[in-house]
């Protein structure tokens, strides 16, 4: 069970990661990351279970540049709920290197799924166990 208060901001990444000791292969893919905020633009869901520190797309892009990662899958987190705008924004800014996994409700429409696909989302996830988010 999550014992972190929603009011406690949790750092979820290293501010100064060190360069990797090995050279990654061509087309290396980071297969599961999240982006958070900035909150001034992408509100956190009131239903979230914790409050991660902002980890915007620019930090992700800088990390990937440092590590030599050329492709990535960004997974929508419960932090932003089913408003997938933060991932959509990162995909758009990623220059074709990023794809997404959207978080949707069970009653998502075919039209919304088509829209998400047109914006670079290639999968969806559901959150059946909200207490674990």
Would you name each region that the model predicts?
Residues 4-12, 81-133:
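Active-site gating/metal-coordination segments in enzymes
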């Amino acid at each position: 069970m999550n014992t972190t208060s929603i009011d406690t901001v949790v750092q979820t990444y290293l501010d100064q990661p060190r360069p990797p000791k090995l050279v990654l292969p061509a087309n290396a893919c980071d297969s599961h990351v999240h982006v958070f905020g900035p909150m001034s633009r992408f509100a956190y869901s009131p239903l979230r279970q914790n409050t991660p520190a902002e980890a915007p797309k620019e930090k992700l892009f800088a990390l990937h540049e440092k590590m030599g990662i050329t492709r990535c899958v960004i997974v929508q987190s419960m932090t932003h709920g089913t408003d997938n705008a933060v991932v959509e924004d990162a995909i758009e800014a990623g220059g074709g290197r990023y794809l997404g996994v959207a978080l949707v409700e069970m009653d998502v429409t075919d039209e919304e799924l088509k829209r998400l696909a047109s914006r670079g989302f290639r999968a969806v996830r559901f959150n059946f166990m909200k207490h674990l988010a």
